[in-house]
């Protein structure tokens, strides 16, 4: 053994430097959070569970233009449009999203001209069966009603960058 190796092993240099490093981090604030009880910060651009939004008067926003269906790379969206109304507008009779196929790319949200389909802030939507991940229009509208306040706040925060 060389002399420097003997000195290091006798003086326990590695042990002391490791202990000093541990003591340094002991007094710093913790970097981890206790997840189920504490929630970390999410960006306004976070892409979570899908939702269909309504106008303040309660009418659904979707105008059945089918741009989201056309732009979806996973082909997870299926839309059927109803007949035109007396005022010339259309609404959907069927709006389905297969969340198993969805890759959460956000292209449907980008393509929508009236901000009807959005990816909301909810990421805790575990299910027991695969069929529960087939979202129909009623479930999407219920998600929109439940998360509307936070969705509107996120869209407003992101508006300068769109």
From Swiss-Prot:
List where in the cell it is found: Cell inner membrane
Q: Which reaction does it catalyse?
A: a quinone + NADH + 5 H(+)(in) = a quinol + NAD(+) + 4 H(+)(out)
Q: What is its EC number?
A: 7.1.1.-
**Mind listing the GO biological process terms from this record?**
aerobic respiration
| Positions bound to [4Fe-4S] cluster 1 | 62, 65, 68, 112
Q: Domain (4Fe-4S ferredoxin-type): give its ranges.
A: 52-82, 93-122
First and last residue of the signal peptide: none
Annotated cofactor note: Binds 2 [4Fe-4S] clusters per subunit.
Where is it mainly found? membrane
Membrane topology term: Peripheral membrane protein
The function of this protein is: NDH-1 shuttles electrons from NADH, via FMN and iron-sulfur (Fe-S) centers, to quinones in the respiratory chain. The immediate electron acceptor for the enzyme in this species is believed to be ubiquinone. Couples the redox reaction to proton translocation (for every two electrons transferred, four hydrogen ions are translocated across the cytoplasmic membrane), and thus conserves the redox energy in a proton gradient.
The name on file for this protein is: NADH-quinone oxidoreductase subunit I
- Species per Swiss-Prot/TrEMBL record: Methylobacterium sp. (strain 4-46)
Taxonomic lineage of the native organism? Bacteria, Pseudomonadati, Pseudomonadota, Alphaproteobacteria, Hyphomicrobiales
**Quick one: which gene encodes this?**
nuoI
């Amino acid at each position: 053994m060389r002399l420097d190796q003997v000195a290091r092993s006798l003086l326990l240099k590695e042990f002391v430097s490791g202990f000093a490093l541990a003591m340094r981090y002991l007094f710093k604030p913790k970097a981890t959070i206790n997840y189920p009880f504490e929630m970390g910060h999410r960006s306004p651009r976070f892409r979570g569970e899908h939702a269909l939004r309504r106008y303040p008067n309660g009418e659904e926003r979707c105008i059945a233009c089918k741009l989201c269906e056309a732009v979806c790379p996973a082909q997870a969206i299926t839309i059927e449009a109803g007949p035109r109304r007396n005022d010339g507008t259309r609404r959907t009779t069927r709006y389905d999203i297969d969340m198993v196929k969805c890759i959460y790319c956000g292209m449907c949200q980008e393509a929508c001209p009236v901000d009807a389909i959005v990816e909301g802030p909810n990421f805790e939507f575990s299910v027991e069966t695969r069929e529960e991940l087939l979202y129909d229009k009623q479930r999407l509208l219920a998600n929109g009603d439940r998360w509307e306040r936070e969705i509107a706040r996120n869209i407003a925060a992101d508006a300068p960058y769109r």
